[in-house]
Amino acid sequence: MVLIRVLANLLILQLSYAQKSSELIIGGDECNINEHRFLVALYTFRSRRFHCGGTLINQEWVLSAARCDRKNIRIKLGMHSTNVTNEDVQTRVPKEKFFCLSSKTYTKWNKDIMLIRLKRPVNNSTHIAPVSLPSNPPSLGLVCRVMGWGTISATKETHPDVPHCANINILDYSVCRAAYARLPATSRTLCAGILEGGKDTCHGDSGGPLICNGQVQGIVSWGGHPCGQPRKPGLYTKVFDHLDWIKSIIAGNKDATCPP
């Protein structure tokens, strides 16, 4: 009888733990420490709190969202846990920042892209390495990966110590047009998410990567509030459409403009 009571109590504890664990995330889990070597965190010198993500695309350049620009910005590379510092964690400051049309002018749904040149290049290491730019645009239905230190609660600002990752799908742009009023008929953005909801990027993930088949296809831009609602997928700046601009800037053509 005592054994039965003990087993029953253990079962209750296990169920309670499972319920609490499921409530801690917006459809994702802690990223594997080796899967995000290109993921960077943006913060300001004063706040010390990550406000955005970014993507290392070579040893000297980081891709992020225009909405993530701040004064006195800092870029943290090689980070996993905010409580345990990896030996190869590095911090950089921008040497130059570039925006579409040579200015930080973007609408809520367009031209949300920023290219940061680091003041000092970084070297590849155990936890730092760039990711490839896209060779082709992503196909509909493709499963892609999002990641970041953004909030893990849809109702309150609860930021994790480690980056969280989730798989989402590339959706037809018409799905996002149906979800959000005033979206233009065409846009250089990707629509991605889970129609049933429950998996989504959220506050603090902006600027981070949408990774598809080992290439950065999107930049986290914006989405529904609260995060993770059914039929409210996220909008991601389409990197493929900005390839010529990105490559021109990196090659030294500072007057390059984004596609219309």
UniProtKB/Swiss-Prot annotation:
GO terms for molecular function: serine-type endopeptidase activity; toxin activity. Glycans are attached at N83, N123, N124. GO terms for cellular component: extracellular region; secretory granule. Keywords: Disulfide bond, Glycoprotein, Hemostasis impairing toxin, Secreted, Serine protease homolog, Signal, Toxin. This is Snake venom serine protease homolog KN7. It comes from the Eukaryota. Residues 1-18 form the signal peptide. It is found in: Secreted. Gene3D superfamilies: Trypsin-like serine proteases. Residues 19-24 form a propeptide. Belongs to the peptidase S1 family. Snake venom subfamily. Its main location: secreted. Disulfide bonds join C31-C165, C52-C68, C100-C258, C144-C212, C176-C191, C202-C227. Snake venom serine protease homolog that may act in the hemostasis system of the prey. InterPro entries: Peptidase_S1_PA (IPR009003), Peptidase_S1_PA_chymotrypsin (IPR043504), Peptidase_S1A (IPR001314), Trypsin_dom (IPR001254), TRYPSIN_SER (IPR033116). Residues 25-251 form the Peptidase S1 domain. GO terms for biological process: proteolysis. Expressed by the venom gland.
